[in-house]
Amino acid sequence: MTLIKPFRALRPAPGRAAEVLAPPYDVLSSAEARDRAKGKPWSFLHVSKAEIDLEPTIDSHDAAVYAKARDNFHRMIAEGVLVRDDTPCYYVYRLTWQGRVETGFAAIASIAAYA
């Protein structure tokens, strides 16, 4: 049985990564994210911290926040900001944060062994 397989990821279109780039959702408050995303309509913060596009009084766990994240994500795809790779791939990535480097691997994984 195959345990991992490649997949066709959604990634920023060529030349658009700088527009999409955003810090992890859990390192900024909603106010900081709102400020950082100001004037950056394609920042991924509009997905990962979608409350920044709603009234500041809304709870960040409100269903409206998740609906806004979905809508923003779909808009990024529809506008060609995020595009799906043509062929299935395995992905290696590296994150650097505050002097710490983490390297990861992304693939489709079977959960059958855990069922």
Question: Whereabouts are the PLM-identified features?
Answer:
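A cross-family signal for N-terminal binding/gating loops and helix N-caps
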Residues: M1-Y114
